[in-house]
Amino acid sequence: MISDMPLVCKRFPRSAKYNPDWVLASISGAANPLWLSEWLAAAMELQPGMRVLDLGCGRAASSIFLRREFGAEIWATDLWFSASENMQRIRDAGVEDGVFPIHANARSMPFAAEFFDAILCIDSFPYFGTDDLYLNYLAHFVKPGGRVGIAGAGLMQEVDAPPPEHLLEWWTQDLWCLHSANWWRHHWDRTGIIDVEVGDTMPDGWQFWLDWHKKVAPDNHCEIEALEADQGRYLGYVRLVGRRQGSVKLPDNIETVATQYTKMPLLRTAAT
């Protein structure tokens, strides 16, 4: 039992209802998926019956939470974690009527255009969303006027090379995908595809990150020491929410190009 885990928090009253042992058994990364889901949902205006894509859902804890708390229908989509295991977790939580596990790559999803009323991504968007072309692809799946929202680990200010000395030991090459809320806002705003409504950071987000990490990964001294040394100067949680602009024409999502082979001579014939 881990009943002493810091899950009972006034900042996240919905999350505090869930058994800490269940939360720990359902995590798939370094962040508390319920805290981030509750924080993001506060800016999303989710309603019962909405079709929602939970992109990069991990082990579907966020999907179960969103279904139970808001009554939306959730497509729990992830590449790294088994849809079959997620189905067991969903069934045990009693929400199989409204949470549907999907195994898919974020860059090759099996959904119809404009199928979703909203798209959420909890602590996974930097893995694929920094690509300049990705928002063009993702926006196809949400209805015009529908919201797209992301929340997860990020930066309070951009990091230049080399990283600050107090982060050097922890900072690996993959962490260059982390960005600030202002960076994400610019990344989306410039396309015209999304009208950004919210771009902010969680107050004391670094402290929540640190407290959670001390409980779930106490042996990860490198990350814990980096957070303690940083004190929120660079590290924390970021959130971005915007609506798809219906007036913007999206480029086609091209997966294959139909061609027909025509056999032709390889070399020029000698002049006679």
For each feature predicted by the language model, list its residue ranges.
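A short glycine-rich, Lys/Arg-flanked "PGG" loop and its adjoining helix->strand segment in the class I
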Residues: 132-147
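Short alpha-helix
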Residues: 176-192
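Conserved alpha-helix/loop element of class I SAM-dependent methyltransferases that forms part
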Residues: 31-48
